[in-house]
Amino acid sequence: MTTQVVKVIGAGLAGSEAAYQIAKRGIQVHLYEMRPVKQTPAHHTDKFAELVCSNSLRANTLTNAVGVIKEEMRRMDSVIIRAADECSVPAGGALAVDRHEFAAKVTEYVKNHPNVTVMNEEITEIPEGPTVIATGPLTSPALAAQLKELTGEEYFYFYDAAAPIIEKDSIDMNKVYLKSRYDKGEAAYLNCPMTEDEFNRFYDALIAAETVPLKEFEKEIFFEGCMPVEVMAARGRQTLLFGPMKPVGLEDPKTGKTPYAVVQLRQDDAAGTLYNIVGFQTHLKWGPQKEVLQLIPGLENAEIVRYGVMHRNTFINSPKLLRPTYQYKHRDDLFFAGQMTGVEGYVESAASGLLAGINAARLLKGEEPVVLPSVTAMGSMANYITSTNAKNFQPMNANFGLFAPLEKKIKKKQERNEAYATRALETIQNFVNI
């Protein structure tokens, strides 16, 4: 048993997971979280693992790479996935959570661990000794400056945008219908169908609506998975019809026909009183935002309880700076985790924290840090962000394209994905007790 302490900076998804993994291995953790002493532009509470974008952790099935990464994490006792499973709300084939219950549960599990000491203060310098930096996309300016000095690399800037949340009672239920795309899983989404004329009116208003201005020195680089709806719309009138307003598989039961466009609403809390507008992340000003959203059939009188907002996201050039153990190449006892590493998504961020935490604990115990094979979802993510072309490095979600190729080619997509999943879960069993 070592008497050394690991400092974990940031109690988001990655930091909470890292702290838990280190603590459960018998090592003391000092977990630093600047909230509520200092807030970020996107957070609203002092809870750990607060979800600031969607409340969905995405697909839960093993034919999807993010479903595989979740199952790997379950088997490795992820505190984030355990809390998510316990706080889930209906979402078809996806794992969505009541965001308030989820954050409270993660906070409880991590804070109450006897090996975790929570420090509510801002860290402005990179500490000496074993450290995991998991400060996320909204790293404070002081620490960001230190990290820039440490790495010698310029940061990249892009923006994630959060979708509006509305009260269910303000939805005109006579104009919407309950259905999941292609009837997969339970009917979990409220669907707002649009005619071509309704879509065109909506589109024209969206394109003309005023957005919150960005600072001149910041480049607009959006990650495709969380792109503001107005930026997507600016690419062309048809773009939304192949994105968040895609109507295929969502036939209107009243007409038996597929609408011209569909806006989907997903349950956001366990009580089913709040719904978020799927894929409608935005940084429109609040007045125009309400006017545009009320052009959606069924939302004419929508009460918006949280407007869509936009915030900066920051990540390092991991191919140049990190090993697949999440260690900094030039300092063995310094680890990075979460979106700062260029993994994109809630689950991927937590997964990086899980592996960084395990390896920080192993380092203190005098054991070799683990590199997970790229036949696993977690290993494929770590491999990608540390070995891809550094020149054009961009954030990446979990996907089967990152996995090591199968020994035998399989033509059918579902069978191929099942083979990836089977191989990954068989392999991860060798690491569940590390």
Swiss-Prot record:
GO MF term set: flavin adenine dinucleotide binding; tRNA (uracil(54)-C5)-methyltransferase activity, 5,10-methylenetetrahydrofolate-dependent
InterPro entries per UniProt: FAD/NAD-bd_sf, MnmG-rel, MnmG-rel_CS, MnmG_N, TrmFO
SUPFAM superfamilies the UniProt entry points to: FAD/NAD(P)-binding domain
GO biological process: tRNA methylation; tRNA wobble uridine modification
UniProt entry tagged with the keyword Flavoprotein: yes
One GO CC annotation: cytosol
Gene3D superfamilies, alphabetized: FAD/NAD(P)-binding domain
Localization per record: Cytoplasm
Catalyzed reactions: uridine(54) in tRNA + (6R)-5,10-methylene-5,6,7,8-tetrahydrofolate + NADH + H(+) = 5-methyluridine(54) in tRNA + (6S)-5,6,7,8-tetrahydrofolate + NAD(+); uridine(54) in tRNA + (6R)-5,10-methylene-5,6,7,8-tetrahydrofolate + NADPH + H(+) = 5-methyluridine(54) in tRNA + (6S)-5,6,7,8-tetrahydrofolate + NADP(+)
Keyword tRNA processing: yes
Cofactor(s) this protein cannot do without: FAD
PROSITE patterns xref list: GIDA_2 (PS01281)
Superkingdom of the source species: Bacteria
EC number: 2.1.1.74
Residue numbers binding FAD: G10, A11, G12, L13, A14, G15
Membership in a protein family: Belongs to the MnmG family. TrmFO subfamily.
Function: Catalyzes the folate-dependent formation of 5-methyl-uridine at position 54 (M-5-U54) in all tRNAs.
Protein name in UniProt: Methylenetetrahydrofolate--tRNA-(uracil-5-)-methyltransferase TrmFO
Organism of origin: Bacillus cytotoxicus (strain DSM 22905 / CIP 110041 / 391-98 / NVH 391-98)
Source taxonomy: Bacteria, Bacillati, Bacillota, Bacilli, Bacillales
